[in-house]
Amino acid sequence: MRAALPPARLLPLLLLLALLGAPAARASRAQSAAPPQPGAERQPRPPPGPGPGNATGTGSGEAAGGGGSSNSSGDALVTRISSLLRDLHTLKAAVIVACAFTAFLIACLLLRVFRSGKRLKKTRKYDIITTPAERVEMAPLNEEDDEDEDSTVFDIKYR
């Protein structure tokens, strides 16, 4: 069973939650504090008459019903667009946080790649030579012991 997250890992999560929550709280406070603007939320209403909900038996209920359904879908579209425009600051903040988090991840991965590349270039002792021969200089370390060719140790320098 895993224990609680260490503080070093918990801090970025708390920061992310604070960044996501702050614009939403600020927008809800601004909406409740701001007085309603005249004409901003005013929608043209269809004239009262026979519609799908209050059709009278005296006439063309089908014609009025068709006009009412197209108008209600238009109202739904206007309502959806106005709600998106109202929450624009929250959406903008969420996109900025997502982009910043993605940039942070890319930077971490690049740092990890460059650090691992430095580790691969360290001097390897007693290893198989995989570098092409024209880029390698080899000199025997034990020059005085030439009778046994199989046990010669070489000093390798890469160009």
Curated annotation (Swiss-Prot):
Parts of the chain on the Cytoplasmic side: 112-159
Keyword Transferase belongs to the record: no
Cellular compartments annotated: Cell membrane; Golgi apparatus
TM ranges: 91-111
Residue stretches of biased makeup (Gly residues): 52-69
Keyword Metal-binding: no
Glycan attachment residues as annotated in the record: N54
Region of interest: Disordered: 28-73
Cellular component GO terms held in the UniProt record: Golgi apparatus; plasma membrane
Homology family: Belongs to the FAM174 family.
Protein name in UniProt: Membrane protein FAM174B
Organism: Bos taurus (Bovine)
Lineage of the organism: Eukaryota, Metazoa, Chordata, Craniata, Vertebrata
Gene label: FAM174B
